[in-house]
Amino acid sequence: RPSFCNLPVKPGPCSGFFSAFYYSQKTNKCHSFTYGGCRGPGNRFRTIEECRRTCVG
């Protein structure tokens, strides 16, 4: 799995409300969160399928 999968989830500094997904190393699963729309770490995916394919394996 890519190292960015282990980055902490952060919504970013903007105030948008976008549905996104992140990988949790603790649970070895992808979870949803609200993304603000800009910046934030690389542990962010548009779909749960993309998150699973990239980080879960």
From Swiss-Prot:
Residues 5-55 form the BPTI/Kunitz inhibitor domain. Expressed by the venom gland. Keywords: Disulfide bond, G-protein coupled receptor impairing toxin, Secreted, Toxin. One of its GO terms (cellular component) is extracellular space. GO terms for molecular function: serine-type endopeptidase inhibitor activity; toxin activity. Its main location: secreted. It comes from the Eukaryota. InterPro entries: Kunitz_BPTI (IPR002223), Kunitz_BPTI_sf (IPR036880), Prtase_inh_Kunz-CS (IPR020901), TFPI/VKTCI-like (IPR050098). Pfam families: Kunitz_BPTI. Disulfide bonds join C5-C55, C14-C38, C30-C51. It is found in: Secreted. Exploits its two major loops and engages more positions in its interaction with V2R. The pharmacophore defined by numerous amino acids positioned in loop 1 (9 to 18) and loop 2 (34, 39 and 44) may be at the origin of the absolute selectivity of this protein for V2R. Interacts with vasopressin V2 receptor (V2R/AVPR2), probably in a selective manner. Inhibits vasopressin binding human V2R in the nanomolar range (Ki=21.5 nM), and also moderately inhibits vasopressin-induced cAMP production (IC(50)=574 nM). In vivo, intraperitoneal injection of this protein into rats increases diuresis by 2-fold, without any loss of electrolytes. Belongs to the venom Kunitz-type family. This is Mambaquaretin-6. It comes from Dendroaspis viridis (Western green mamba). The lineage of its organism: Eukaryota, Metazoa, Chordata, Craniata, Vertebrata.
